[in-house]
A protein has these predicted regions:
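N-terminal Rossmann NAD(P)H-binding glycine-rich loop of SDR-like oxidoreductase domains
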Residues: 5-25
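NAD(P)H-binding glycine-rich loop region in Rossmannoid oxidoreductase-like domains
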Residues: 37-43, 47-93, 101
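Conserved Rossmann-fold NAD(P)-dependent oxidoreductase catalytic core, especially the SDR/UDP-sugar
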Residues: 93-141, 163
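Active-site Tyr-X1-5-Lys
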Residues: 138-163
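NAD(P)-dependent short-chain dehydrogenase/reductase
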Residues: 161-164, 168-206
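Substrate-positioning beta->alpha
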Residues: 182-185, 200-222, 229
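Conserved C-terminal active-site "lid" loop/helix of NAD(P)H-dependent oxidoreductases
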Residues: 211, 270-308
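Mid/C-terminal beta-alpha module of Rossmann-like enzyme folds, strongest
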Residues: 217-283, 312-313, 317-329
C-alpha cells in the first residue's frame, strides 16, 4: 500500500537520497524545499516539491498536509562562521515546526535526524545508550542540535511517536549535486583531496557513512523503529578513521598521488578555529580527551532496524564514479 511521506531538507545530501529511495519503493513524497528549481532531477522521478521555509510553521504545515509520516532532514550545518540565531531558527524552531505538524496532522511517526557531537562515547555503553556529555561543546551547531534532540525525546516521553537518527560523516552521490558538494560537506573535502587541493585536515575519528545508508537507515527507523529510541547510522566499525585517512583512501582508489596530512588541533587553536569552524574544533578537542567505546557490528541499531552499512571502499568507489560522471575529477 502506497503511503505519503513528508521529507524536509529534500535537496540536501541525505534528504535527496531519502526522497529517491522512498519513490523507488513506491511511496508518494512531499518535500519541503526553499527553491524547487534547484532539484529538477527530484521532480523528474516524481517527488512533489513544495516551496517553503522550515522556519515558517505555516509553510511546514501546508507542505505536510496529507502525509502519513515524516522524515526530518533539514538542518543548518556547522561551518567556519556560525551565527547562533540562524542555527536556532533552523535546527530548533524548524524541528519544533515539523514535530507540531506531525502531531496536529495525526502522522503515525516523525523521524528526526540529529548528530552525535554531544554524546559521551567513552561511557562504556553503546552509542544508542550513551549519555549526553556533562559539558557538551558550546558551538551553535551542537547547542541547537542538542536542544532539538531533547525536544524530540521529551515529546516521545509524553506519548508522541517520534525518534531520532544520528548519522556520522555523510558522503556520497546525490540527485542534487550542487547541494551535495556544499563547501561544508565531506563530499567537498574528499573532492578537494582528489584534486590535490586539501593539504591537511583536523585529526579526529570520523565515522564515515554513505548517504544512501543514512537514507535507508532513516526509512527503516520509520518502518521498524520504536518511539523514543535513537539509532546510530554510521559506517562499519573498521572504517572509522580520520578525515585525512579517508581522503587518502579515496585518492588511492582513484589513482591520485596526493595525500592529506593529519593536523593536531592544539597546533594553532585560534587559526584553526577560523579555518575549520568551532564545531570541528570542538569535536577534535573532545576526541583527544576521551577514550571512545569501540563500536560493535552487533548493536542496537543493527538489531532493531537490520541496518548493515556498506564498506568505506564501496562507498568511496561510488562517490568517485559519480564525481567522474559529473566531470569533477
Amino acid at each position: 500500500m502506497m503511503t505519503t511521506i513528508f521529507v524536509t531538507g529534500g535537496t540536501g545530501l541525505t534528504g535527496a537520497n531519502v526522497c529517491q529511495q522512498l519513490i523507488e519503493r513506491g511511496d508518494e513524497v512531499r518535500a519541503l524545499v526553499r527553491n524547487p528549481d534547484e532539484a529538477p532531477a527530484l521532480a523528474a522521478i516524481g517527488v512533489n516539491l513544495i516551496q517553503g521555509d522550515i522556519t515558517d510553521s505555516s509553510d511546514v504545515r501546508r507542505a505536510a498536509e496529507g502525509a502519513d509520516a515524516a522524515i526530518h532532514c533539514a538542518a543548518l550545518l556547522g561551518g567556519a562562521r556560525q551565527d547562533l540565531a540562524d542555527f536556532e531558527a533552523v535546527n530548533m524552531t524548524g524541528t519544533s515546526n515539523v514535530l507540531d505538524a506531525g502531531r496536529d496532522l495525526g502522522m503515525r511517526r516523525v523521524v528526526a535526524l540529529s548528530t552525535g557531537t554531544f554524546f559521551d562515547l567513552g561511557a562504556g555503553v553503546s552509542a544508542e545508550e550513551a549519555p549526553v556529555l556533562d559539558n557538551p561543546p558550546d558551538d551553535p551547531y551542537t547547542v541547537t542540535k542538542l536542544a532539538a534532540f531533547r525536544e524530540v525525546h521529551a515529546r516521545a516521553a509524553a506519548g508522541e511517536d517520534v525518534l531520532t537518527c544520528h548519522p556520522g560523516a555523510i558522503y556520497g552521490p546525490s540527485l542534487v549535486p550542487h547541494r551535495a558538494l556544499h563547501p561544508t560537506s565531506f563530499n567537498a573535502i574528499l573532492l578537494g583531496a582528489l584534486r590535490g587541493r586539501t593539504p591537511m585536515f583536523l585529526d579526529f575519528p570520523v565515522t564515515w557513512v554513505a548517504a544512501s545508508d543514512v537514507a535507508s537507515g532513516s526509512i527503516a527507523a520509520l518502518d521498524r523503529g520504536v518511539a523514543g529510541e535513537r539509532y546510530w547510522l554510521v559506517g562499519r566499525p573498521e572504517d572509522e578513521k580520520s578525515t585525512a585517512a579517508g581522503c587518502n583512501r579515496a585518492c588511492e582508489l582513484a589513482g591520485v598521488d596526493h595525500r592529506v596530512q593529519d593536523l593536531d588541533y592544539r597546533s594553532d587553536p585560534e587559526g584553526l578555529t577560523a579555518a575549520f569552524g568551532p564545531t570541528l574544533m570542538a569535536i577534535a578537542e573532545a576526541a583527544a580527551k576521551a577514550t571512545r567505546t569501540p563500536r560493535q557490528c552487533d548493536n542496537p541499531t543493527s538489531r532493531r532496524l537490520g541496518y548493515q552499512p556498506m564498506s568505506l571502499d564501496e562507498g568511496l568507489g561510488l562517490l568517485i564514479l559519480w564525481l567522474r560522471e559529473l566531470g569533477k575529477i
